[in-house]
């Protein structure tokens, strides 16, 4: 196998790596594709230090986001069971259903914390009872909140 060149990627490159990754590629691939399209630049000692510093800053930022999500999880799970009143028909069947937006509004009124409805995972709620809503706060942090549906 011939000589290979070390490059730092400027952007995500399919089947090669992500932005900021240090990769080794064939000289022709670097010279004819990656470098002319500004997808990567040659890895000099200064560039390697800068890329490492950037990776460390990103790691620190992710750690701070995870810690903030852990705190938010403690607040949400410390609330206990939230109650929502819905109009009911025969056999305890609801008129309509409880939506993720309803739960997000309920959580905001109870805790003061704004929750995006797209982060909520809610089972289908069409009858009275207690349900568990899961809130994805971070890629590694999920909070569970109990919701009780009662007759209006």
From Swiss-Prot:
It comes from the Bacteria. It holds the Pfam family Ribosomal_L9_N. InterPro entries: Ribosomal_bL9, Ribosomal_bL9/RNase_H1_N, Ribosomal_bL9_bac/chp, Ribosomal_bL9_C, Ribosomal_bL9_C_sf, Ribosomal_bL9_N, Ribosomal_bL9_N_sf. GO terms for molecular function: rRNA binding; structural constituent of ribosome. Disulfide bonds: none annotated. One of its GO terms (biological process) is translation. Keywords: Ribonucleoprotein, Ribosomal protein, RNA-binding, rRNA-binding. One of its GO terms (cellular component) is ribonucleoprotein complex. Binds to the 23S rRNA. Belongs to the bacterial ribosomal protein bL9 family. NCBIfam families: L9. This is Large ribosomal subunit protein bL9. It comes from Cyanothece sp. (strain PCC 7425 / ATCC 29141). The gene is rplI.
